[in-house]
UniProtKB/Swiss-Prot annotation:
Annotated organism of origin: Candida albicans (strain SC5314 / ATCC MYA-2876) (Yeast)
GO cellular component term of the entry, any: side of membrane
Compartmental location: Cell membrane
Lipid-modified residues, GPI-anchor amidated glycine kind: 286
Biased composition (Polar residues): 239-254
Region described as Disordered: spans on this chain: 232-261
Positions of the pro-segment in this chain: 287-307
Protein name: Predicted GPI-anchored protein 44
């Protein structure tokens, strides 16, 4: 049986496992700015590197501030993200002559992550400034990033965050209206079961339905109502598969595409479609919380040791 002291030690150990991030952790990223993560924030030996590619992403710092507040130095003075981007470009242009501050700090709930500008391989416009083995996400080409985050439409920041596109512009090909029901009367020799199997079996090969008035092939069935008669009144047959497959060409409901608007430039939102731009999901990369199996294993070993 565990003693009081051993139980206290176990509780402290459990608290540390579940609340302290490991060295493998990184800063808090916004899931809606994966373009910025791919081209701008490299991770190498727990040093977070700022590049002008990251600074290019509109609104990145505004969203990052929603998760971790940027602070400078021991007094935790708030920092403007644009200032850091400016300093990064200035430092890269002339590292030897740079006299400004190069060390910045990013506070999180558990640890302090150092953001440093003085990285020997950093230069403006270079996205793959780290070895690919250290962070594969930094190998993304600049042109690919630019093409993925920009559009031909430019919307002022004061206007709506959505672009409305009428649905008819997305449907250039003609759509034929297919009948959804088959009527029956009293003069045919075909049963309702046969009619159902014939309609269900319509394929690319022409099929013929034989009736007193002649034959109808599958193309005519798809474009004109079909009336098939039988000796006795039959219930109305419905073909929901045809009805559901025929789009409503009369619908003019606009289709909305969510585009995050920052400083007059539209960007593709990687996580939300037709949702508010303020709804941003955040996630911590790595850390002890990211490896629960290790924590559980260590806890079991510790308990076994105490027992």
């Amino acid at each position: 049986m565990l003693s009081t002291n051993n139980l206290l030690i176990l509780l402290i150990f459990s608290f540390l496992i579940t609340n302290v991030k490991s060295d493998l952790g990184g800063p808090c990223f916004s899931m809606s700015t994966m373009e910025g993560f791919a081209c701008g924030l490299g991770v190498h030996k727990n040093i977070q590197i700022i590049t002008d590619c990251l600074c290019y992403i509109p609104g990145y710092w505004e969203q990052l501030d929603g998760c971790d507040k940027l602070v400078r130095g021991p007094h935790h003075t708030p920092i403007d993200g644009a200032e850091i981007c400016s300093r990064a470009s200035e430092y890269a242009a002339n590292p030897a002559g740079f006299t400004g501050e190069t060390d910045y700090y990013e506070s999180s709930t558990t640890v302090m992550h150092v953001v440093m500008l003085d990285f020997p391989t950093y230069s403006p416009g270079v996205t793959n400034f780290l070895d690919s083995s250290s962070n594969d996400l930094t190998t993304t080409n600049t042109d690919e990033i630019n093409s993925s985050i920009t559009t031909d439409e430019v919307i002022p920041s004061s206007s709506s965050s959505y672009i409305e596109i009428p649905s008819e512009t997305l449907m250039e090909s003609s759509v034929s209206t297919q009948p959804s029901t088959i009527e029956t009367s009293e003069t045919s020799h075909a049963t309702s079961l046969e009619v159902s199997s014939i309609i269900t079996g319509v394929s690319s090969e022409p099929l013929t339905i034989v009736s007193e008035s002649g034959g109808l092939n599958s193309t005519e069935i798809a474009s004109t109502p079909v009336v098939i008669t039988s000796p006795t009144p039959q219930p109305l047959l419905e073909t929901p598969s045809q009805e559901s497959s025929a789009p409503n060409i009369d619908s003019t409901t606009p289709t909305t595409i969510d585009n995050t608007v920052v400083d007059g430039t539209t960007t593709n939102d990687a996580t939300s479609v037709a949702s508010s731009t303020s709804d941003v999901a955040y996630v911590y990369i790595g850390g002890a919380m990211g490896y629960p199996s290790i924590s559980v294993a260590l806890g079991l070993v510790f308990i076994a040791y105490l027992v």
